[in-house]
Amino acid sequence: DIYAKWFAWVVEHADGFACISRTVRDELREAVAGRIGQERSERLTYSYFHLGSELDLRENSGGTPGELADVFADPASVFLMVGTLEPRKNHAYVLDVFDKLWREGSESKLCLVGGIGWKCEALVDRIRHHAHAGSKLFWFAKLDDDGLDYAYRHADALLISSHAEGFGLPIVEALQRGLPVMAGDLPVFREVGGDFVAYFDLTDPKSLKALVTSYQRDKADLAPRPPAEWRWIDWKDSANQLVAAATSGTL
């Protein structure tokens, strides 16, 4: 396993680690201790910083593809997923939920944005040959920045269902644009999204189905706090955090 060999080498040679979330820092500290022992692990530094986002908020140049605009052309709710197609992103979980909703007569749409990753042949085949492909299920594998911005600004909610993440940047990108977010109940998502996100149980598809059904009915954000109150650091603050993390190891 390439990653396992790389990580084993890093653990033996690094003096410290700067991670992109507090959650990852804590998980990494535990993993390192498991490999080299608690005493050696405590000699290393562990810090974290958060990614910024405001550079994404720019004026759209008008280059939005017509096919993308068509997805949002009617009143049906559009739920957006952003991320490479790979097992960790857990697209199949969301597809299972929407298959049940569509069988029950839902007119809501699911729009996937992300390129082909790895170990996703079955998922790609499922999407391409889905009964609702092009009518209720849409996939854009090569969307440019303008297109992604358009999708964020016109969707009804972002869904993020990953089994594991280091940060969860789509949460920040969505909330920056006032888009409600529904996310799997992971520690890192709660770290980033806090009370601005509605969480669902990744072991129980019924919990996501209930959120989507409620949103379809009421068109109201289900999180305790609305996106309008969302504030996040900019890239200058992010860079300052990284410098502090790299120089002090105590962030």
Q: Can you name each region flagged by the protein language model?
A:
Residues 1-251:
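Carbohydrate transferase catalytic cores enriched for Leloir-type hexosyltransferases
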